[in-house]
């Protein structure tokens, strides 16, 4: 019985961990953004699973009001493309409430991940992982690609 359990666990683990992240059955995951026990925004990520790639479209909206008056706004929209479990491209836009706006673009090129953001063009390790809430793999990384500003953290 012990051996059957180990074999079943091995088969299940190889299926579950063959992707860098699990794709939800309904191809969507959403989070509420909570501050001081109040819902101030949302993050919605939609997964498009193609034959050889996964495209993740994420929208983050935050609106903070004080006495019904807007005090802070934030908006971010990104489209990430993953092929064979590897992060290969990003196209994003971030709008901070203080008029800062960033266009984030990145692609795998010549064994590097070439990206642009608030600091201009960056030549990063091809295996860089984006900073995203749904991807637990980022917790194992020493450096991640910040998709809000297009910088390395």
Regions found by a protein language model. Name each.
Residues 1, 18, 78, 102-104, ...:
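Charge-rich, low-complexity amphipathic helices
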Residues 3-12:
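Sec-dependent N-terminal signal peptides
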Residues 15-73, 90-100:
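N-terminal cleavable signal peptides for secretion/export
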Residues 24-26, 91-153:
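Solvent-exposed helix/loop surface patches that form functional interfaces
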Residues 43-48, 76-81, 104-106:
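Hydrophobic/aromatic beta-strand elements that line small-molecule binding cavities or substrate pockets
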Residues 61-62, 76-77, 108-112:
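Juxtamembrane/interface motifs at transmembrane-helix termini
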Residues 86-87:
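A short glycine-rich beta-turn/N-cap micro-motif
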